[in-house]
Amino acid sequence: MQFSSEWSQGFSAQWAECAQSRARIHRTLHDMCAMFTDQDEVSRLAAGGQNPLIYEVSAWDAPSQSGALSFGVTVLHPGQIGSEYYMTKGHYHVVRNTAEVYYTLSGEGVLVTENEDGQCILLPMAPGAASYVAPGFAHRMVNTGSQP
C-alpha cells in the first residue's frame, strides 16, 4: 500500500506498514537516564555497557495550519529499571490548549497525566482502549506488562 500524505483531502493508512516507512525516534536508557529515580541501577547498567531501547516513535508531521491533527505510533518496550517500568519521557504540548488521543494496539500499561496544578490522573491502557489527554495536561505512557 502506498501511504498518501494528502492532508487536505484526508487519507487512510495501515498502521504497521506506515510505521515502518516513517523516520523513527529511538529512546534508549542513555536518553532516558534522568527519568528514572533509581540512579544506582542506571549507573550499574551503564557501567556494564547496557543501553536498552526503551521506546520508538514513528510520527507523521501534520501541516502547521490551525486544526490539523498529527498522529504517530509509539512502541513502548516492556522492562524495568530498578522497580520502575519503562516509560516515555512525557511532555506538555507547546500549545497548551491541545488535546491528544492514545489508542492502544497491544500490551498494557498506564497513561499518566498531570496538570500544572499537580492534579494527576492515571488512565488504564489495554488493547482496544482509547485514552483522552485533556488540554493542559502533561502525559507519559508506562508499560506495566510483558508485551510492547
Predicted regions and their residues:
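Histidine-centered metal-chelating micro-motifs
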Residues: 110, 130-131, 135-140
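Active-site region of the double-stranded beta-helix
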Residues: 17-127, 144-148
